[in-house]
């Protein structure tokens, strides 16, 4: 599986995209298996398709272990992890955590995910000097005890 970002650059992996690939190959009759292995730039991933009445209902994927060490994410920072750390983005301090789940991610909690000036703030985070390989940015709003609203740049 080759994954490309919106700007045309390569991505190592995308959990949602690989699930779509699993559904696609089953729906198109390219396989009738319910356990698939797919090669990605982040390694070989295993998928399990939950099929009922010939239709894929859900796809589960083994993403591997998350990587929290800054040098493995990568994040230009010292320490054992980069969790709940302040960074400056466009003159504002944000508390962020970073992880690699096949490609770099940066997670920050916000009061209102839909109110963000996404076209402005997204690229500023993605291309921040902290992320030498850039990063996927998740802006997470806690809606209630059971619901999160997440916008991904």
Where are these regions (language model features)?
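Active-site proximal loop and beta-alpha junction motif in alpha/beta enzyme cores
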Residues: 1-13, 18-153
């Amino acid at each position: 599986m080759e994954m490309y970002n919106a700007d045309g650059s390569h991505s190592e992996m995308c959990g949602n995209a690989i699930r779509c690939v699993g559904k696609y190959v089953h729906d198109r009759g390219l396989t009738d298996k319910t356990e698939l292995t797919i090669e990605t730039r982040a390694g070989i991933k295993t998928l399990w398709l939950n099929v009922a009445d010939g239709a894929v209902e859900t796809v589960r994927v083994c993403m591997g272990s998350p990587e929290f060490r800054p040098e493995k994410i990568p994040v230009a920072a010292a320490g054992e992890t980069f969790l709940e750390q302040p960074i400056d983005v466009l003159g504002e301090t944000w508390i962020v955590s970073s992880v690699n789940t096949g490609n770099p991610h940066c997670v920050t909690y916000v009061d209102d995910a839909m109110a963000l000036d996404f076209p402005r703030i997204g690229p500023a985070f993605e291309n921040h000097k902290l992320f030498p390989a850039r990063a996927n940015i998740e802006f997470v709003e806690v809606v209630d005890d059971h619901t999160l609203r997440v916008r991904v740049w």
